[in-house]
Amino acid sequence: MWGDRRVSVVLMTYAERESIRSVVEGFYATGVVDEVLVVNNNAQEGTAEEVERTPARQVFESKQGYGHASRRGLIEAKGDLIVLAEPDGTFLPQDIHKLLVFSDQCDAVFGTRTTRELIWHGANMEWFLRWGNWAVAKLIEALFNTSHLSDVGCTYRLFTRDLADLIAERMQIGGNHAGPEMMLLAITSGARFVEIPVNYLPRVGTSSATGSPAVAIWIGLRMIELIMRFRARTPRRMLRPSRLGTDPGEGD
């Protein structure tokens, strides 16, 4: 619980058999998590059994892709505050406290992995990933007149229940570039949001998305294409985010 609000953590898994059990246990150990929901997205053999050894609830999403799994998690989670994270050991469960602190004033809290002092030795944050994520984030800032953003690829984030429902209803991207879509849906909904630094650790195992520079570059290009298309269909009146629950464009 965070105050009087229930906290759900959603973990989407595909290739995290070696780490998922310890990550689930780590989130419960924080003392603020009421539910850990694991979305099994056609995960490697043995993953489901690892999850069953924990108190986590597991659901199965057959449509392959980060976007499909995230949407399922947002729909299935029962909490008032919903935290998305990776079960690969790259994020510290303890950092959930940072996100929760800002949930008292914000509808969305996005993590950023671009603070050098919090990037651990061996973490997969080479210069092209760090600066690439930064550049795409600045593109969103410029096109959507937003608050400060520095990392579109960070998947450690928090949404309120109302905002999670709105995002799940409007999501269209099923693949690995769904992260910026969720961010853009939050921005254009009028949600109040903030970005905060989180720790970034070496991954346990190999990533199917960013383990290869070529794949990471391809995902980045898909993100840029998505952002440009999203901007083209967004009315100018929606480029000054307002408080969630008010008419877009009214401001605070």
Give each language-model segment a name:
Residues R6-S8, E35, E181:
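Cell-envelope/extracellular polymer assembly enzymes that use nucleotide-activated donors
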Residues N40-A48:
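A conserved acidic beta->alpha catalytic loop
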